[in-house]
Amino acid sequence: MMNYKFISTIKFKEDLSKLDNSVVKTILKYIKKLELSDNPKVYGKELSGNMAGLYRFRINNYRIITKFENDKFTIEGLAAGHRRNIYNIYSKRLIK
C-alpha cells in the first residue's frame, strides 16, 4: 500500500505560526506518523454537518482539520488550533 503525503495549505501554515513551538513540533511529529501509515484515517474522526467529509485528529489539546484525496494519497491540512476554538475558526473560513 502507498503512504500518504501531507500538504499544508497557506491557512494551515498561518495557524501553526500562531502556536507555541513545542506544540508545533508535536503536531509535525504526528503528521509524520500519518504519512507513514497505510490507513491514516483510523487515527482521526470524520466530521459531520458543515464539515462533512473532513477529518479531525487529536493531538493533546490541539486539533488539525484535514481533507483526504484518496486517489492521490494526499492529506490536505486545512486548519490547526486549540480544541476550544478550532471548529469556530474553520467554520468562519467556510462562510467566507
State each model region's role:
Residues K11, A52, H82:
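Residues that form or immediately flank small-molecule/cofactor binding pockets and catalytic motifs
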Residues M1-K29:
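Arg/Lys-rich, positively charged N-terminal/basic patches that mediate binding to nucleic acids
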Residues M1-K5, E14, Y62, K67-K96:
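Enriched for short, Lys/Arg-rich terminal
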Residues K32-R56:
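A short, surface-exposed loop/turn module that caps and links secondary-structure elements
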